Amino acid sequence: MHNNKVEASANSSMQNSAETRLETGQDHTEQAITPTSLGLAGLVTLITTSCGGGSGGGSTGSTSSAFSSTSSSSSAVSSGSSASSLNASSGSTASFTSASSASSSSVAPVPDYTPAEAARFLLQAQFTATDQEIAAVKAVGYESWLNAQFNAPIDQTGAQWLTANGHATPKDDGNYFNPVFGDWMAWNQLFTGTGQVRKRLSLALSEFFVVSLSPIDGFWPPMLIAGYWDLLNAKVFSNFRNLLEDISLNPAMGFFLNTKGNLKEDTASGRQPDENYAREIMQLFSIGLYELNLDGTPKTNAQGNPIETYVQSDITNLARVFTGYDWDYSKVTQQPGFESYPVPSPEFTSGRMKFDANKHSKLAVSFLGTNIPANTSGAEALRIALDTLFNHANTGPFFCKQMIQRLVTSNPSPAYVQRVASAFNNNGSGVRGDLKAVWRAILTDTEARGASTSTSGKLREPIVRLTQIARTFNVSSSNGKWEIYDLSNADWGLGQAPLRSPSVFNFFRPGYVPPNTVLAQQALLAPEFQLHNETSTAGYINFISNFIKDGYSDVKPSIAALEPLALNINALVDWLNLHLTANQLSAATLELIKTALKTPNLTSASSATAKNNRLYAAILLVVACPEYLIQK
């Protein structure tokens, strides 16, 4: 799998993380380089240490941070380029208003977005920016295009895919215990189908309301995680309050955070309700640790210290609400599995957990100033508790800031957070928690659509990078199995995989600051950099290099639609710049990549292998460059 391997110790420049290289602004003398003279790995090492922040591609004395590369519109390619057929089917297929109707007398005219502006919006809202998608956004504008995606139907769900591929029926090989089919399902969901916006935003939700496949054992881990993923997809455009209730009663969440089988107190044994979910629903899923202003900044007491949102007694009391729940086996049938061992059918993995009043605490509950009387029914206690969290002043800014971080920028201004949190509090029609209003506010805000700054942007997550590459280059499975496993290992994988968080705290913390960096000196957040180090840098380049050329297992992208550009280096690199980075690469970086691709010289008589190698190298050089990795 890992030919052309880049060793972290092979070159001193590779020993520095991409973040460090970006912020030091070290000077690299540009020189003529070729795939022949350096090899592909050497080329990538040079590119990743040469294309840096600022407008000069790594100018001497730069004090810019890792976010300092600015968007460039140089060498823009029109949406009608010769590779326009690439990935025609990967984007959303929701219908949209025609340009003529959008510009009618009763509707404001659509702004004349450039292809780069449309691509930038698309790469924040979903995974790809194909020519068809760019044209659609330009035709109707951001909001109308988003509305079409909000109304687009769900195609195949994760559970449906598992069922269709035989992963929901017990087999002699013990498939009902095997979690890897959950990985196959997750990658298939990200790589295929329509409704990219739904899936991109569901991925963001999965890193806020975290459930991980890794600790789930027993019967049907793949179906359990599929049920959770399908829930997020189904409710991503609904209301936060409804979503909060659905995830609280979801079977996978019940297993992950111990509400499954959570019993009421027992005075004889001293048993108390498990407090895990009660803690995490406050700390991570709703209000956070400290009181916030509407703009996401912390409130402070007279001594200037942050004010805690809850104390231990709040957790202990709230835990009583989440007792009496367990998986619902009422529709399950026993089926023969390995050596005829009885296996329950997977109906319990979707829907909600069942409630048993006999196992539910009848004690009074007092938390966050709310009192639930003793002997309140389980359903009513749950309603009061979730309403309390939903209506808390913290919930809007706490949730919205993290969604901005996932989609647009690691360091949103307080004003940006306040505008989005205000949309959470009131969608304009008096409705609180309308997620469509939140997504619309995030993606159309002036801070998202305006010019990038030295502190805007974020590091693209490895999952997002791979999904973008896969969809942009029409990935397919040779046998329909989509056998992509857990890629969380940074040595040979990506250091990240969907629905495989190492803990309930996600792959990275929203407040993470890389220590001993310019980012730390400037007090800038960079959550995704918690995944980034020397090992992950080399691992990413190794993995992507092999994936682009050889695929992974039965899964492989196609460069067929790029082949007409193999002999036109300028058009090739400019096409990649627009569709992969929204013209974010600087002129210096573009020139460096184009120079590298000139040798060996190719003609129409050159072999198909030589032409394809140029295409592989071009893609890799773009997606290995820090100006791509930092999405503006």
Annotated model-derived regions:
Residues 1-37, 40-73, 79-82, 90-105:
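Bacterial Sec-dependent N-terminal signal peptides
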Residues 43-46, 138-141, 150, 162-168, ...:
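Active-site substrate-binding loop specific to GH73 endo-beta-N-acetylglucosaminidase modules
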Residues 107-155:
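N-terminal mature-domain "stem" immediately C-terminal to a signal peptide or N-terminal signal-anchor/transmembrane
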